[in-house]
Amino acid sequence: DQSVRTWLGCHRRAFEWFGAVPARLIIDNAKCAITRACMHDPQVQRAYAECAEGYGFRIDACPPRDPQKKGIVEAGVKYVKGNFLPTRSFRNLADLNAQVREWVLKEAGLRIHGTTRVRPLDTFAVERSTLLALPEVPPDLGSWHAVTVHRDCHVSFERALYSVPFALVGKALWLRATDAVVTVYHDFKPVATHARARRPGERRTVSDHLPP
């Protein structure tokens, strides 16, 4: 799942686990992060730019077609797949998280790393002093989506419908969705705010949005 919502949520959970934020993140050109890869002027996904501003980190996109500039992350994924997953079963996601946390702290983080020749947890203990502090108030993370107002004065997002003022029928608007709230914008101004629907087919309607 490389949706923007999942991408941002993974960042939040990682930063909370570390208890701090790296000052610079090297990012491969996944669409949930970089909408246009470019050597000199990459286009950052709008919601991800807001995340970076809220946490204070800098986004450093990898140059396209230059594998030498990428962070060495694939090897870590391969290590987890080969050493953690094969011999285990999980009741649910919470059980998986509890098991992997114990594995990192008692096994994976204490091994001698094949490249650095240092235990990963020892490296992290040294690096932690260089990290940024978490913000006192976590940023309100949300994803942006282009929407068009239907003739019934609603916009559609993830198979749910949200009303906007009837004068905007036919207009192209922007919708920002957080885990709890959906806000619709016209000309950079909010025109409607709704609690986020939880079921496909739900309608969130404000009577004042409808024509008299």
Mark where each language-model region is.
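Active-site beta-loop-alpha junctions of metal-dependent nucleic acid enzymes
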Residues: 1-21, 198-204
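Extended, hydrophobic alpha-helical segments in both membrane/secreted and soluble proteins
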Residues: 7-11, 26, 48, 59
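RNase H-like two-metal-ion nuclease catalytic core shared by retroviral integrases
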Residues: 27, 38-39, 57-81, 94-96, ...
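A short, flexible beta-alpha/helix-coil linker loop
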Residues: 29-34
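Two-metal-ion acidic nuclease core segments, chiefly of the RNase H-like superfamily
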Residues: 41-59
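Active-site-proximal acidic segments at structured loop/helix or strand boundaries
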Residues: 77-176
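Protein C-terminal end segments and domain termini
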Residues: 179-212
